[in-house]
A protein has these predicted regions:
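ATP-binding/phosphotransfer module of carbohydrate and carboxylate kinases, centering on a glycine-rich
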Residues: 1-12, 21-125
Length: 125
């Protein structure tokens, strides 16, 4: 999935928010955004996590996810953002169509394999 060119970011949507940032294929250390505060004193983990998705329903949660991704874009200026995790498939088609350019969706299995690869990269440093 990671092409190795430019800044590539991965976010996973599930019980919370997971992320990884790669520059030219190299994993950037200490790029943990899930514990950042987003709104009403909530972390991104809480704001986009499964509990909120169940509370809001897919329609409203999808809009929230899109707005968060739109907010990340000017901060990270990615060449490509990959969105995965168990809840990525729950983002509605309407909200997917409104996402910024250079956003791709990947199956949940891809995110799990990428997470294992990230641990391997961290362990070898």
């Amino acid at each position: 999935m990671i092409g190795g060119k430019g800044l590539e970011m991965i976010i996973t949507l599930g019980t919370g928010l997971g992320n990884a940032v790669f520059l030219n294929g190299v994993l950037a250390p200490h790029a943990e955004i899930s514990q950042g505060l987003v709104r009403w004193g909530m972390t991104y983990d809480d704001y986009l996590g499964e509990h909120e998705r169940l509370r809001l329903g897919d329609h409203h949660w999808s809009r929230r996810a899109r707005r968060v991704i739109e907010g990340f874009e000017p901060v990270y200026l990615w060449d490509m953002l990959y969105v995965g995790g168990g809840n990525a498939k729950r983002i509605t088609d309407t909200q997917r169509a409104r996402m910024p350019a250079k956003v791709a969706y990947v199956p949940n299995e891809t995110g799990m394999l990428g997470g294992l690869r990230a641990w391997d990269l961290i362990g070898s440093q």
